[in-house]
Amino acid sequence: MEYELIVVGGGPAGLSGALKAAQNGVRVAVIDRQEELGGQLVKQTHKFFGWSRRNAGVRGIEIGRRLRDAVLAEPRITVFTGTEALGYYPDNSLLIESPSGVSRITGKTFLFATGAQERMLLFPGNDLPGVYGAGAVQTLMNVYGVRPGRSVLMVGSGNIGLIVSYQLRQAGVMVRAIVEALPQIGGYAVHASKVRRLGIPILTRHSIKEAHGREYVEGATIWELDDKFRGIPGTEKDIDVDVICLATGLTPLGDLLWQAGVSMTYVPELGGFVPIYDGNMETERSGIFVAGDAAGIEEASTAMLCGEIAGLAVAAKLGKIPRHRFEEERNVLAQELSALRSGPLSSKVRTGYERIKALVQGRRG
């Protein structure tokens, strides 16, 4: 099977890219390991920020449904769910595994929107049942309707940690505290205000010291941190919890990009190793594009815009649309992307993308 574009990852970036490419005449295949398209959106019950034409005030699960319905209704898109991309080969093919077996699929271009994985912390007892990543807790509650426990310690005060803490309380689960290693809260003030109104304490310059329990989590010890993020002896506090939820960040998933020979670089502001790519989301390997968290950890709103830019660029590269039209539409999308990244909490992300931009310019001489 050969397609003009193969999209790996059926989350917000991948689906947006697939739609934009297909709407401009490209034959697309979308591959996702999950049975349901939507990626992280399927478990995001909170409302998005931004402006109305970019889903402001719409819940993530509804955005995911809209994208999924649009993709399934597009005749130029073939969807492979429950299918995992196992490897990239030099003949521009992917080895994929589906319920029907293992096969190869070939593409003229590729969009890798493979997302990210949660970062874990090292501490005594971190392998006990009851220690979860925040994404796993969201999946349990918002997809399967299962409460993870009765009492939670949240580690990390970024948007995910704050939002999941609020959702836990809505589900009737006690959140004993949110601990944050940094001297300030990492997420939006609106989310922090919501959890504080529920009486959940947010302790900055604190972290978990250890988890307690023999067969599962039965408690945790937290302590204060000094300016070098070292625990301060004598500041320990024991907390009665049966769940420890780690919302300590994400790191991009780039396995297939490494296999494809894409040039990668370490950018801490973007979460780790990311591909080097230009303003069209194309990597230094011609015909290989990237979008979403695989290109750098960011919000779903910006991931969708980056996916659209990539899909539009694929259509232009394959000669489906004239260059002048591509540049006009790309510039509009780029302006919207810049506006979404203009807030103070996006300063770290902007620094990361400036690093990527400088690398690209330097290599082009």
Set out the residue ranges of the language-model regions.
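Residues forming the flavin
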Residues: 1-365
